[in-house]
């Protein structure tokens, strides 16, 4: 592993779960029946642990990174959309016209759009676009590794640097977002490699494939797993990410690692972002305590993924857009959980009698 990457991972402190009891004691002393705010209490307690027991809890400023990259596997016919849509959507993000732009504005969340691996050379200069291209797309995973180990490590380090910059700007929470035509295919391949799942069980329509095309997509993923089997079986999670992933997926995995390094809460978006989280978790298990799955993707295989991760998404809205949209929405809940912890009165403060034991 790259020395710089190893030094970041070694510097990550696991979340102190021993603080959970103090967090719950505070929540139980607020003017409400115990547990009556449900998962908001769980969120608040986890945020307290991430903060190391420091109060008040803070989620803001919050920032979503929508990271874009192209995929060689697009040539295998696994998406109904042409590859140039990746580039077109990056320009749409930069101009403020996409779903993620609207939802970030609604949620009061900062948005940064990142070209990590788009085809077509540099974009025109734009104040809303971060241009740090690691490479121009990937090779087809159905024919060999998506990228070299060096390229993958550069993408991971790019993501780490994005988290470092967010922390330097005072952010307390970051969110993951993606854009890359065909990127449900490498994401599915990563789930199969990391979690031992079968492509036939978790492969879905992505951006709208018909049933026959989904069956073709399953076969493409099977070929990818077979041609890269020697890499996957060697057990190196970074090499597996290089073999089966994408540049934006690796960058988002680095963002997760960087968030943990700087003690930031990290809100994970949908199907592709959860693949990036899974890669980061395999590379450094301690990142898990900093991460929150924002929503249950409508991709058919996502339930199997969540079960394999033993995780519970926050929202169930049938979303399948990506871009970071679910993460932006979930930041409302993160903010609400922090405010409850910070601002609700205790029984003693309010002069309210507690329930009898």
Swiss-Prot record:
Transferase as UniProt keyword: yes
Sorted UniProt keywords: Cobalamin biosynthesis, Glycosyltransferase, Transferase
Pathway: Nucleoside biosynthesis; alpha-ribazole biosynthesis; alpha-ribazole from 5,6-dimethylbenzimidazole: step 1/2
Residues the record marks as active site: 323
Top-level taxon of the source organism: Bacteria
EC number in record: 2.4.2.21
GO molecular function, one term: nicotinate-nucleotide-dimethylbenzimidazole phosphoribosyltransferase activity
Catalytic activities: 5,6-dimethylbenzimidazole + nicotinate beta-D-ribonucleotide = alpha-ribazole 5'-phosphate + nicotinate + H(+)
One GO term of the biological process aspect: cobalamin biosynthetic process
Class of this enzyme: transferase
Known role: Catalyzes the synthesis of alpha-ribazole-5'-phosphate from nicotinate mononucleotide (NAMN) and 5,6-dimethylbenzimidazole (DMB).
Family of the protein in this entry: Belongs to the CobT family.
The protein's name: Nicotinate-nucleotide--dimethylbenzimidazole phosphoribosyltransferase
Annotated organism of origin: Nitratidesulfovibrio vulgaris (strain DP4)
